[in-house]
Every structure is written in C-alpha cells, then in structure tokens.
Amino acid sequence: MAGGPRRGGRRRKKVCYFTANGITHIDYKDTELLKRFISERGKILPRRVTGTSAKYQRMLTTAIKRARHMALLPYVKDEN
C-alpha cells in the first residue's frame, strides 16, 4: 500500500473570513487584507486552503487582479 495507513481525525470546517467579519465589499486598495490570501510566491490561494466562500473568492480574485494591474501588488515575488 502506497502512502501508509490513514489516520482518522475530524477536521474543523473552515469558516469564510468575510462572512464571519461581516465584510460585504472587498476593496482592491486594501493590500494588507489581500496579502492574507496570496501565497509567499504571489499566487492566489485556493478556497480549500483559505475556507473562503465561492462568492467572496470571486470578489477576492477580481480585487487581487485589479491591485496587480494598478501595481499595488506584485504578480510574482522573488525567490530570494
């Protein structure tokens, strides 16, 4: 068997950050908020990692892309 035995454990359900905090609009100028949802390499983190709902993931993606276009966020980050 590849991978070894499976461990039984219940994972805690991830809660959407925006729903929990009552945020209805994601502003592309709020770079500190957007940086929470970007990997150290500059990629947008997926929903399964962050727990963001589909509605807010779409808004988040649009805001990050706008911030990148306006040079508020980098497209990629250096290795060093």
Curated annotation (Swiss-Prot):
SUPFAM superfamilies: Ribosomal protein S18. Transmembrane segments: none annotated. Disulfide bonds: none annotated. Keywords: Ribonucleoprotein, Ribosomal protein, RNA-binding, rRNA-binding. One of its GO terms (cellular component) is cytosolic small ribosomal subunit. One of its GO terms (molecular function) is small ribosomal subunit rRNA binding. One of its GO terms (biological process) is translation. Pfam families: Ribosomal_S18. InterPro entries: Ribosomal_bS18 (IPR001648), Ribosomal_bS18_CS (IPR018275), Ribosomal_bS18_sf (IPR036870). PANTHER family: 30S RIBOSOMAL PROTEIN S18, SMALL RIBOSOMAL SUBUNIT PROTEIN BS18M. Binds as a heterodimer with protein bS6 to the central domain of the 16S rRNA, where it helps stabilize the platform of the 30S subunit. Part of the 30S ribosomal subunit. Forms a tight heterodimer with protein bS6. Belongs to the bacterial ribosomal protein bS18 family. This is Small ribosomal subunit protein bS18. It comes from Staphylococcus haemolyticus (strain JCSC1435). The lineage of its organism: Bacteria, Bacillati, Bacillota, Bacilli, Bacillales.
